Amino acid sequence: MSREVMEYDVVIVGGGPSGLSTAIKLKQLNPDINVCLLEKASEIGAHILSGNVFETRALDELFPNWKELNAPIKTKVNKEKFIFLGKSKFLSWPTWLLPKVQHNKNN
């Protein structure tokens, strides 16, 4: 029985934020390296864009020109709210009680 074989220098399991940024950085450091990124979703990043608040610092570091590349990040945050979700109830938390790292700024 014969099987098709594909050889890679690096295989990354999971196309989430960590796996995707690892693959990107590896290719930036060495464009000749063969990288395989395995993802269970129908396409890479399918589970990433979820309507969440996205801190763009990682994009700035990986792709300094990401805004010119027409990245699908268009909506700026105009209001902030922090809510704890329980099984049957929720609790709104005043944003002034949150640490600075939890505040959205310039996104």
Show where each model-derived region lies.
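N-terminal Rossmann-like FAD-binding beta1-loop-alpha1 element of flavoenzymes
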Residues: 5-36
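N-terminal FAD cofactor-binding segment of flavoenzymes
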Residues: 29, 40-87
